[in-house]
Design a protein with these regions (language model features):
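A C-terminal junction/extension of Radical SAM enzymes
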Residues: 168, 174-177, 181-241
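Canonical Radical SAM [4Fe-4S] cluster-binding loop centered on the CxxxCxxC motif
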Residues: 7-46
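N-terminal [4Fe-4S]-dependent radical SAM core
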Residues: 1-15, 25-27, 58, 234-239
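Short, conserved loop/turn and helix-capping segments at secondary-structure boundaries
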Residues: 43, 133, 197-201
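Short active-site-proximal "capping" loops at secondary-structure junctions
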Residues: 33-35, 70-72, 98, 221
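Radical SAM/AdoMet-radical enzyme domain recognition
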Residues: 46-66, 73-173, 177-178, 183
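A short acidic, helix-capping loop that chelates divalent metal ions and anchors anionic groups
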Residues: 34-39, 123-130, 191-195
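Flexible loop residues that form catalytic
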Residues: 34, 69, 120, 187
Length: 241
């Protein structure tokens, strides 16, 4: 059976959050001291994850993305990847990139080709400020390692007005020199602030004016509140901006 929602949209893409734990403390995500975590008995083990994934694949899901928290800090991540790789489905993963170098071989062995890396700034100082960890160089080097090993890399960047919105063009310029794509994600604070889509989209649409190939991720932003604009290496003009 095909999974269809009330708007008649067919769903073939499943996201599985493997853990709520993370080795960063991003300011927009959690306080410096962390958050209360669920007991281990409330977290799915690898057999349960496989059983759920198998059921969805049998119901026409063709792609599964593993997320967190930080999925690569699960101690049984290699077992999970191996079991899911046995299913007829495309596997992808979203990570903060800190421990990627430890898992490159396993990711390759399990035919994971598409990896999204969360990186909100190209400044080492800003990275430390927003993540409360001094790991920028590690993450950036692991992105280069992914490229070297032939993975398809997409960078997810949360744009925060007054913090890193001045880096939009720097992010985009990077696609001229590295075979990567960028996806800008809106900042959605947890304090009840109203989201102003007109204000956000105006800032993001500066990119097309500079000659970059951009793709709006969904015409109706009501259904696309977290993915607004994707900047890719395709069609990029060979010039500085």
């Amino acid at each position: 059976a095909i999974l269809t929602d009330q708007f008649k949209r067919k769903h073939t893409y499943l996201r599985i959050s493997l853990t709520e734990r993370c080795n960063l403390r991003c300011t927009y995500c959690m306080p410096a001291e962390g958050v209360p975590l669920s007991p281990k008995t409330h977290i799915m083990n690898y057999d349960e994850i496989y059983a759920i994934a198998k059921t969805f694949v049998e119901n026409v899901v063709t792609k599964i993305r593993l997320t967190g928290g930080e999925p690569l800090i699960r101690k049984d991540i290699h077992v999970i990847l191996g079991k899911l790789a046995s299913l007829p489905v495309e596997l992808a993963i979203t990570t903060n990139g800190i421990t990627l170098d430890r898992h490159i071989d396993v990711l390759k062995e399990n035919n994971i080709k598409n990896i999204n890396v969360s990186l909100d700034t190209l400044s080492e100082g800003k990275f430390k400020e927003i993540t409360r960890r001094n790991q920028f160089e590690k993450v950036y080097n692991n992105i280069l390692l992914l490229i070297e090993k032939g993975f398809n890399v997409k960078i997810n960047a949360v744009l925060i007005k007054g913090f890193n919105d001045d880096e939009i063009i720097d992010f985009i310029n990077l696609t001229k020199y590295l075979p990567i794509s960028f996806r800008f994600i809106e900042f959605m604070p947890f304090d009840g602030n109203k989201w102003d889509k007109n204000k956000i989209i105006n800032a993001y649409l500066e990119a097309p004016k500079k000659g970059f190939n951009t793709e709006l991720m969904g015409k109706d932003l009501f259904y696309w509140t977290s993915i607004l604009l994707q900047i890719s290496k395709k069609g990029l003009e060979n010039r500085d901006i």
